[in-house]
Amino acid sequence: MKHYELQPSELKIMNVIWDHNPISASEIASILMKETAWSKNTIYTLITRVVKKGFVKRTDPNFVCEPIITRKQIQQQETKSLVDRLYAGSLNMLFARIIEDENLSDAELDELRKLLDQKR
């Protein structure tokens, strides 16, 4: 699996692009200026960064952005990284921690059981 270096600020940019694909840079800026304290220049810099990293394809006119990598690719990578760093690669330890520490409803527990049963 290819490793993607994605900073938290870049992930915010990617989430907007994934949610509104395709989307222009000005629309991204409009959305994020409402959600963050970032300036338009900061947002454009972050967009340029994800384009240069190869995560986003930019087309003119209007600097329209489309994702090259998927949300699922990033989720898989970040999940593996978390499991490796905090749980010595053990998914069992991660699931045990979630089940022990979180206040899961019966519906959530049922959903987890269904997911596990589907993997058998």
Segments (PLM) and residue ranges:
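Short helix-coil junctions and helix-kink-helix linkers
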Residues: 30-38
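Amphipathic alpha-helical dimerization/coiled-coil segments
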Residues: 80-120
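Short acidic, hydrophobic short linear motifs in intrinsically disordered regions
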Residues: 23-31
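A short, conserved structural fragment
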Residues: 51-60
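Short beta-strand "wing" residues that participate in macromolecule-binding interfaces
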Residues: 58, 67, 106
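Short, hydrophobic-biased segments on the C-terminal half of alpha helices
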Residues: 44-48
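Pre-recognition alpha-helix immediately N-terminal to the DNA-recognition helix
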Residues: 11-16
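Short, cationic-aromatic polyanion-contact patches
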Residues: 3-9, 61-80
